[in-house]
């Protein structure tokens, strides 16, 4: 379980997240949407301690993130918008191995984690290829594999479809469906609900740093325009 409790985050005098509470159950897919500047990216960056709250807290499996940052980051994987800016290895395998190596895991375990993660995103035969030579969709899948190699309970993806053409978007979406079916919790941040509508167990719409709407996709669809969100 990932729990956000009365979270507040400020950038100077601007309140980016204002008293937000949200629970994400094991195996659930929650889609967080809203216009630019609504606070959705700031919210999810608290989920594994990338940001510190001004008030409130985030708990991962019952433990506040700030009390055990290493455990939180092992449990909550992050895939950032434009992940190609954050690749740390020249090859696919080196990039995916980076996280487990930093955990100090044995080489045999690292190799197994890398193999499992690449298989999960259907890049098992691409381990020795240069990340820079891959397509945008393939690079997105490498970023997902790098997060999966940490064997997280929850996977947070910030605008995972940005800049991808239609076939690449569908490829990434297929991988997310498979991960969801296998029991991985997903928190997907997007301003465009068309790709993830059928994937979501719940939709959370943010506006001005607050949750304006939340619920099952079928229940909230008609109210999305009132929350400032274009329906799919």
UniProtKB/Swiss-Prot annotation:
Localization: Cell membrane
GO cellular component terms given for this protein: ATP-binding cassette (ABC) transporter complex
Species in which this protein is naturally found: Halobacterium salinarum (strain ATCC 700922 / JCM 11081 / NRC-1)
Main function: Probably part of an ABC transporter complex. Responsible for energy coupling to the transport system.
Entry protein name: Putative ABC transporter ATP-binding protein VNG_2317G
List of residues binding ATP: 34-41
CDD domains reported for this sequence: ABC_cobalt_CbiO_domain1
Pfam families linked: ABC_tran
E.C. numbers: 7.-.-.-
All copies of domain ABC transporter, residue ranges: 2-231
Superkingdom, natural source: Archaea
InterPro entries for the chain: AAA+_ATPase, ABC_transporter-like_ATP-bd, ABC_transpr_CbiO/EcfA_su, ECF_ABC_transporter_ATP-bd, P-loop_NTPase
């Amino acid at each position: 379980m990932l729990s956000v409790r009365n979270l507040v985050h400020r950038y100077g005098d601007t309140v980016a997240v204002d008293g937000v509470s949200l629970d994400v159950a094991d195996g659930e897919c929650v889609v967080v949407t809203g216009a630019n500047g609504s606070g959705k990216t700031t919210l999810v960056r608290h989920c594994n301690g990338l940001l510190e709250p001004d008030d409130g807290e985030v708990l991962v499996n019952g433990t506040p993130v700030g009390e055990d940052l290493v455990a939180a980051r092992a449990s909550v994987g992050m895939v950032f918008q434009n992940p190609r800016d954050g690749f740390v290895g020249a090859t696919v395998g080196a990039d995916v191995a980076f996280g487990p190596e930093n955990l100090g895991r044995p080489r045999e375990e690292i190799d197994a984690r890398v193999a499992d993660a690449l298989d999960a995103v259907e890049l098992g035969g691409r381990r020795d290829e240069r990340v820079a030579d891959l397509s945008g969709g393939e690079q997105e899948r490498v970023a997902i594999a790098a997060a999966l190699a940490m064997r997280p309970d929850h996977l947070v993806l910030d605008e995972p479809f940005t800049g991808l053409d239609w076939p690449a978007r569908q490829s990434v979406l297929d991988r997310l469906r498979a991960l969801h079916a296998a029991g991985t919790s997903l928190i997907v941040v997007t301003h465009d609900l068309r790709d993830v509508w059928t994937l979501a167990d719940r939709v959370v719409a943010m506006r001005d740093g607050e949750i304006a709407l939340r619920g099952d996709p079928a229940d909230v669809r008609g109210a999305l325009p009132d929350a400032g969100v274009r329906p799919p």
